[in-house]
């Protein structure tokens, strides 16, 4: 939970998945912690404290997008990652920048609904259990001559116990459940996303309240009934208010590939549309009000984190007004041989662990010797230097090439132990790493 984590705790959490790039991690951790700090400030001043947006600059494959992905999991807040290249200025074919906030609102509604349903889950489980028992043991009809049996009779209690122990999971029952409409997708013209959304929700509301009988296993029925009962206990209006407040106060937007909409001074053509997207982004980043189907959303306190490789353009190629909206600049460094080694050994879900787990399913024991790891790191670094620097992604290609034959014949090697040392790596990748023409096409 990000609001209770200190910046150093956030950084150490990111360290489990991303090697190096401490400047970027620190900037992101401080920005995340500042959301919590702002909430502790008294009201007149709190409104004036706006988030300091971040611009991450660095070559591809060094961890910019990965920082965003991991941040999304850490941040107990509405978070959306989008590519700036998807958008065009109003009037062109493409997405309108206001859809960023609408998508963020959808994310917040989903997140809030999940957390609200968790709170009422115990009550929902009890109600679902009673409904299931009513189907398994229909209550006897009262004809008027005798008292109806107690609801929790002995038989009912026996069935309740069996249900809780999972003994009835595979029993087939027929149940009346809410009918779901077949999902339909409505394609609207560019810039008319809001109207399209309204038409979609209008059609979605038409089938509400209808029920139909379905045959299913008790286990599946129990899950369905829990969801139905939880939905009854959640107040939709209250949920909307909470979600909108959460977007306005804690929302985070990660704008990837922002360098692709920067004007490249030496190139002509296409600049109008690029500048248009930047100008459309301006009010959103600075603070405006966007209309969504859940209500109006102010963007004043939404945190924007932008990132780009800036190979062909520079941050100064962005329009000055937009540059000013991203006061915190962080440069990410290219990866060294030591970084590649750390990526292969120190991260929580490193490639070496992934391949070991995959081959273990075929009963092949894969072991990586330190000199083998070092050689792999050297080859990945060397190919990046000679051909095209694609950062950590180069390791995917190198590892796949290294273990190609072993993966193919794994079933025949069942029960064997394979050690990947420097000699093994050189035997399979040595020629490719040395021959620049070959590595250009193969690695």
Curated annotation (Swiss-Prot):
**A GO-annotated cellular component:** HslUV protease complex
Question: Which processes are annotated in GO (biological process)?
Answer: protein unfolding; proteolysis involved in protein catabolic process
An example Gene Ontology molecular-function term: ATP hydrolysis activity
Q: What is its main location?
A: cytoplasm
Record's SMART domains?
Answer: AAA (SM00382), ClpB_D2-small (SM01086)
Q: Which residues bind ATP?
A: 19, 61-66, 256, 321, 393
Where is this protein found?
Answer: Cytoplasm
List all membrane-crossing ranges: none
Which HAMAP family does the entry mention? HslU (MF_00249)
* Family that this chain belongs to: Belongs to the ClpX chaperone family. HslU subfamily.
Its name, as the record gives it, is: ATP-dependent protease ATPase subunit HslU
Species in which this protein is naturally found: Cupriavidus pinatubonensis (strain JMP 134 / LMG 1197) (Cupriavidus necator (strain JMP 134))
